[in-house]
Amino acid sequence: MYEGEIFLTMDKKTIIEETEKYYLPVFGRYPMVMELGQGCRVWDNEGNEYVDAFAGIAVNSLGYNHPVLVKAISEQAGKLMHCSNLYYTEIQAKALRMVAEATGMDRIFFANCGAEGNEGAMKLARKYGVSKAPTKYKIISADESFHGRTFDTLAATGHDYYHVGYGPLSPGHVLVPYGDIKALEAQMDDNVCAVLLEPIQGEGGVHVPPDEYLQQVRALCDKHDALLIFDEVQTGVARTGKWFAYMHSGVKPDILTFAKGIGGGFPVAGFAVPERLAHVFKPGDHGGTFGGNPLACAAVYATLTTIKSEGLVDKVAEKGEYFKNELRKLQEKYPARVKDVRGRGLMLGMEVAGEGKPIVESCLANNVIVNCTAGNVIRIVPPLIISKEEIDIVVAALDKALAAC
């Protein structure tokens, strides 16, 4: 490759061939080459325009090319992109304060992806546990959960599909049915250092537990001096109509993990703890080269300040209710096809009878992007800025898909 060749335009066929040739085959991709995004719209390199109701897997919280986010990242790139966490930066200090305020926590650790955040949370919980007793290392998580594909998060993830071929998994992990307090109670003892849950299961099918379930989990953790970890990688950052989903129930975790939407599309993640857990880790116990770098912190600061200044938390709650009601109209129209509509804010799931993939493909053919999870749940996690007019476009595409599939 000669200098400058990377900037030459490739056609669709070449792009796909080059990607398939060099990238490990770990993704199931659609034969589309995305080129440009603006707001809630994205264009492929053949000029086709799509309304995106998936937001890059709940990541693009401000949509595509939000001017505040673009300006913040561009200006920071022109000043300082990386210097390591051996030094202080102003933008990191600003981002830390914003995350602390949004999460309701006191201390923050920045990482690069949700799995890293969850790994760090479990690592802190293990150290907390064994400081109390050498056998206090058990971590309980839920069936149908998803916490990442790194080795320890894999053991905490409640899908057999992800476990096949990777045994023996990390020891000390126990799975229980989600929402079943008696099953959890049967596994709880003084050897449990943490319970790890999603306040709303995403990958498992957009399952919303009753508020009293989370309250009962909190009580069990308190009884056994176990830390309650909420994985808010997908549910956090205004996604559900609150800054973080735990705020719906009033059940505050001991550790909260975040990622996806917090950088508005820039890779950044981490976890947050109250002051009483701030010194479980000592210098050198945990860290990372890139976590909390200036570019990531600029993205975090711009994203959170924009969500706050534009009043998006309340707007998400309002638009989410409208969206859910429109989906319920489809359920009434197609009672044999739509089994359930559930979720909070702009994290919605429409469970269908039969496979969901044909519905996703039909929507794509009608220039709308949605996703299918758990085999038959159409997952809808659009940018937080989606308009009611764009919601109507998504619902119309789903209507066509349900009629045809």
Regions found by a protein language model. Give the residues of each.
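Conserved N-terminal phosphate-binding loop of PLP-dependent enzymes in the Aspartate aminotransferase
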Residues: G4-C405
